[in-house]
From Swiss-Prot:
Keyword Ribonucleoprotein attached: yes
Stated name of the protein: Large ribosomal subunit protein bL35
Lineage of the organism: Bacteria, Pseudomonadati, Pseudomonadota, Betaproteobacteria, Burkholderiales
Keyword Ribosomal protein part of the UniProt annotation: yes
GO cellular component: cytosolic large ribosomal subunit
Length: 67
């Protein structure tokens, strides 16, 4: 049986942490930033963990990654 393919889009968007959790980037930070406050943009920096309700979908897109 052939290997399962990883979704290319998911490979670029998610990183698996050593503990098995998955980190992702924040949304709403690409464009239309002039109307957003500095505080709002600052809070959108950095990465956050994928919520547990979405982990099944993310794990299906990233087979063989230990999720």
């Amino acid at each position: 049986m052939p290997k399962m393919k990883t979704k290319s889009s998911a490979k670029k968007r998610f990183r698996v942490r050593p503990g098995g959790t998955v980190k992702r980037g924040q949304a709403f930070k690409r464009h239309i930033l002039t109307k957003k406050t500095t505080k709002n943009k600052r809070h959108l920096r950095g990465a956050v963990a994928v919520h547990e309700t979405n982990m099944v979908s993310v794990a299906a897109m990233l087979p063989g990654r230990g999720i």
